């Protein structure tokens, strides 16, 4: 999928693979919809909901666990923004690795080891830290 839509050439997607374009196309250019964007980062980089909010009048909630990028999310978006780590189990303490768009929750099933992540971030001169967070 390319990053513009045949019916509306003014649409430019900021999502990684055109997820927002798929939503608009599937819902026939629906206006005033509602979204829940989990892992919203700064609200613009690779955003699946920014275009829906700005061009189509959608409202919703952006959730971002990384406390380092959350202030940017809050300033970049009009919708409700929540700094929280969501999980299927409430009130568990989980280790969250803060690494911009590569952030993730510690678990035994991840494909990339922590050492590989740290090396990648070092090569790209990107910050990294690990924090404990309570799930919601």
Regions found by a protein language model. Name each.
Residues 1-136:
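Phosphate/nucleotide-binding beta-alpha loop and adjacent structural elements of enzyme active sites
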């Amino acid at each position: 999928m390319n990053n513009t839509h045949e019916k509306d050439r003014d649409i430019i997607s900021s999502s990684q693979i055109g997820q927002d374009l798929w939503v608009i196309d599937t819902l026939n250019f629906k206006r005033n919809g509602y979204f829940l964007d989990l892992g919203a980062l700064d609200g613009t980089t690779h955003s699946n909901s920014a275009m829906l909010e700005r061009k189509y009048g959608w409202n919703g909630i952006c959730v971002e666990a990384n406390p380092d990028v959350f202030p940017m999310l809050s300033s970049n978006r009009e919708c409700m923004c929540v700094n929280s780590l969501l999980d299927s189990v409430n009130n568990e303490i989980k280790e969250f690795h803060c690494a911009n768009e590569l952030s993730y929750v510690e678990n035994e099933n991840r494909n990339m080891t922590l050492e590989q992540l740290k090396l990648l971030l070092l090569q790209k001169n990107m910050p990294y830290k690990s924090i404990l967070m309570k799930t919601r």
